[in-house]
Each structure stands twice: as C-alpha cells, then as structure tokens.
Regions:
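Hydrophobic alpha-helical transmembrane segments
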Residues: 1-13, 85, 89, 134-141, ...
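Functional transmembrane core segments of multi-pass inner-membrane proteins
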Residues: 7, 98, 103-106, 110-205, ...
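Alpha-helical membrane-inserting segments
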Residues: 18, 22, 84, 88, ...
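Membrane-proximal soluble regions of multi-pass membrane proteins
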Residues: 18-73, 227
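C-terminal ends of transmembrane helices
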Residues: 19-24, 60-68, 108-118, 162-173, ...
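Select subsegments of transmembrane alpha-helices in polytopic membrane proteins
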Residues: 72-77, 123
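Interfacial loop-to-transmembrane junctions
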Residues: 177-178, 211-236
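Conserved post-catalytic alpha-helical subdomain immediately downstream of the catalytic base
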Residues: 193-223
Length: 258
C-alpha cells in the first residue's frame, strides 16, 4: 500500500511538471524560471497553492488573488499521469521497464496535450525521446536495437507515405511532419507491430470522433483535430495491451485454419 501511495504522489508530481512543459514549451519559455504565476493577474503562485490536484480542489478552480478560472487541464494532466504510472506498476512492478515506460508515458501525455492546444509536436520532446528509446533498446530483453530501428522506420515511414500521397492528391497537408517524428519515437519504443497497432487504432478512434462532430454540426462542417491527440493515448494503450490484442487477433485466424 505504501508503494502505491508513493507512486501516486510520484505521478502527481510529474504531472505538475508536465503542466509546466505543456504551457511553456510552445511559447519558448524557460521551464524553470520565472516561477509559476496566474495567467490572469500575473501574481506569483505560492507553493501551497501549487500542490497537484489538492490545491485546485481547495481553491475551487479559481486563483486565490483575482478569482480567475484555473483551466481543468492542470488537474487532468496530473491525474492522468498518476493513473498511467499506477497502470504501468500493476503490470511491471518496480522494474527498470516500469521507470522507462513512465518516461515514455510522460512524453505521450505532453505531446498529446501540446498538439491538442497548439497543433505542434515539438522536436524537443520527440527527438530526445527517440534517442533514449534507442539507447534503452540496448538493455532490453523484449526488443533489441535492430527491432527498435525497424519499428521507428516502419511507423514513421508508413505515416510519411500517407503524408506524401495525400499531398499529391489534394495539394495540401493532411498530416504534419510532427506526427511522423512522433511515430519515430513510438515505433522505437514499441516495435513495428505495436506501432502499426497504434496507427490503426488512432485512425479508427479519430474517424469515430470525426463522425460524431460531423453529425453534431452542419453538413459543411470542417472537422479538424490534430492526429497526435489520438496517437498519444493509443500508443499508451499499445504499451499496456497491444501485444495481447495482436496475439488474440492472430489466434482467430489460426483457429479458422482447417
């Protein structure tokens, strides 16, 4: 029980840092200074008003000084990070893979939210993440360096092909190159099978959300939501359950074989 509490606190603390990253990185601000302040009145936030989730609840989602509303994104990111860490712990306990996967999950959360709010996927996250994933593959038993490289090339290459084909047909970008670099990271950490699983699931979920928005709006409604917003949660789902789902799917064909 003590370990679970520590992991929850660890996840909430990392989530608080991710909130800083999500807000500041797209604005090219330093991640460490100046200290956090209210976006409405610029009053510096005291440490006791910056406790993950708890401060938001005690302040009822408002700044102590100007009563300006605090976005729900802050507690949401903190809770998502804590839950992600708990899910990873439930599968891998306190292993090296657990800590590495926590970093991968943090990268996905940051990329997903930044893409949702700013429609960019910063290289400052994807490229260092790719490098760490490749280095980590040297110490893994489930995925070696060769497989990590194949995963990166396969995932990003397929998306790059779609990018080029769409541009040739429509004369405009259907995907951003940031999605391609994000798939380099995803493929390097998960391998080619789970990279394709991520792409298929993200496309399916994105299509469902798109259909929902189209039905809720007028017929000429132009639906647009960054693909990285879907890649992030589906890549995490692939990390947790991807291999089991793929194996279960393939076993169906084996059972159908006469």
């Amino acid at each position: 029980m003590e370990t679970i509490i520590i992991i929850i606190c660890f996840g909430l603390a990392w989530g608080s840092f991710l909130n800083v990253l999500i807000y500041r990185l797209p604005l090219r601000m330093s991640l460490f200074k100046p200290s956090s302040s209210c976006p409405h009145c610029n009053e510096k936030i005291k440490f006791y008003d910056n406790i993950p989730v708890l401060s938001f609840l005690l302040l009822r989602g408002k700044c102590r000084h100007c009563k300006g509303r605090i976005t729900l994104r802050y507690p949401l990111v903190e809770l998502l990070t804590a839950v992600s860490f708990l899910l990873l712990y439930s599968q891998h306990s306190l292993s090296f893979f657990f800590f590495a996967s926590c970093l991968f999950a943090c990268a996905l959360i940051a990329l997903g939210f930044i893409d949702f709010y700013h429609q960019i996927l910063p290289d400052e996250i994807t490229l260092p993440g790719l490098l760490l994933a490749l280095i980590y593959s040297l110490f893994r038993t489930d995925l070696n360096l060769r497989q990590a490289l194949i995963g990166a090339v396969a995932g990003a290459g397929f998306l790059l092909f779609i990018y080029g084909a769409y541009y040739l047909l429509r004369k405009k970008e259907g995907l951003g190159l940031g999605d391609v670099t994000m798939m380099l990271l995803v493929g390097a950490y998960l391998g080619w099978r789970q990279a394709f699983f991520t792409l298929i699931l993200a496309s399916f979920v994105g299509a469902l959300v798109g259909i929902f928005f189209i039905f809720c709006k007028k017929k000429d409604f132009q639906y647009s939501l960054p693909f990285g917003t879907f890649l992030a949660p589906t890549a995490f789902a692939a990390l947790l359950w991807g291999e089991r789902i793929i194996n279960a799917y393939l076993s169906l064909f084996k059972n159908l074989t006469p």
